[in-house]
C-alpha cells in the first residue's frame, strides 16, 4: 500500500511538472481512476483507454467515470451503447490484442520446431495459462497440476512470464510431469491441442 501511494504521488508530481493538455490513462482502474480524479481537480482533461468493466461488476463506478473522465476509448463494441445510456461519451477503438496477435502469427514457429526447441515429445500438448500474478499462480496452478495427472497421454506445458521467478511455478508443479516454458505464451498456444486458461486477458488471447 505504501508503494502504491508513493507511485501515485510520483505520477502526480510528474504530470504537474509536465503540465499536459490531457492525461491518457490506460486500463488499471484501481490506480488510474484515482489519477483521473486528481487530474480533473487540477484542470487537466482526461482520456481513458480500456474502460473499467463496470458492466460486469461494481457498476456504481459509472458515476466516477462520468465525473472524472472526459473521453472514454473502449475495446468492446457493445460498450458504446452501454456508456451512451449512462451519459458518457465513448469511442470504439478496438482491442490492441488483435493487432498484436496478428503481427506475431506469421513469426510463430511450427509445432514441430516448438517441441524441439523446448525438449518436448510427440504427445499432444495442453497449454496451462495459470495467470500473470503471484496470487493467480498460487490459486490456479495446483489445480492444473492435479488435472495433468489424469491425462498421461498428453503433455502439459505451463506458460510462464519473466517477471515471476521460475521457482514460484515449480513450487506448485512438484511431483507432476508439467513442463515450464517462459515468455512463449503465443508459441505454446499455437502448438497446443487445448488450453486451460485463467479467466482474464489470456482468455481473449
Predicted regions and their residues:
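Active-site and donor-binding regions of nucleotide-sugar-utilizing enzymes
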Residues: 1-118, 129-140, 150-153, 161-163
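Structured loop/turn residues at beta-strand edges in well-structured enzyme cores
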Residues: 18, 67, 121, 176, ...
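Structural motif
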Residues: 21-22, 125, 194
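Short loop/helix-cap segments at secondary-structure boundaries that form the rim of catalytic
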Residues: 80-87, 167-175, 205
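Residues that mark the start of a beta-strand
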Residues: 125-126, 155
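Donor-nucleotide binding loops and adjacent catalytic segments primarily
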Residues: 134-193
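Short alpha-helical segment that forms part of, or immediately flanks, the ligand-binding pocket
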Residues: 186, 204-205
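Acidic donor-binding loop of glycosyltransferase active sites
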Residues: 190-203
Amino acid at each position: 500500500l505504501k508503494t502504491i501511494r508513493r507511485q501515485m504521488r510520483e505520477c502526480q508530481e510528474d504530470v504537474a511538472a509536465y503540465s499536459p493538455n490531457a492525461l491518457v490513462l490506460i486500463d488499471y482502474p484501481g490506480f488510474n481512476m484515482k489519477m483521473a480524479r486528481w487530474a480533473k481537480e487540477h484542470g487537466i482533461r482526461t482520456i481513458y483507454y480500456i474502460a473499467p468493466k463496470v458492466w460486469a461488476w461494481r457498476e456504481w463506478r459509472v458515476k466516477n467515470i462520468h465525473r472524472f473522465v472526459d473521453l472514454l476509448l473502449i475495446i468492446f463494441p457493445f460498450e458504446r451503447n452501454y456508456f451512451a445510456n449512462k451519459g458518457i461519451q465513448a469511442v470504439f477503438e478496438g482491442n490492441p490484442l488483435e493487432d498484436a496477435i496478428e503481427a506475431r502469427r506469421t513469426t510463430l514457429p511450427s509445432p514441430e520446431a516448438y517441441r524441439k526447441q523446448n525438449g518436448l515429445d510427440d504427445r499432444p500438448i495442453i497449454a496451462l495459462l495459470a495467470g500473470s500474478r503471484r496470487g493467480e499462480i498460487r490459486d490456479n496452478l495446483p489445480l492444473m497440476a492435479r488435472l495433468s495427472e489424469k491425462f498421461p497421454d498428453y503433455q502439459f506445458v505451463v506458460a510462464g512470464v519473466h517477471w515471476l521467478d521460475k521457482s514460484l511455478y515449480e513450487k506448485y508443479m512438484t511431483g507432476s510431469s508439467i513442463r515450464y516454458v517462459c515468455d512463449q505464451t503465443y508459441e505454446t498456444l499455437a502448438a497446443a491441442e487445448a488450453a486451460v486458461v485463467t479467466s482474464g486477458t489470456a482468455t481473449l488471447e
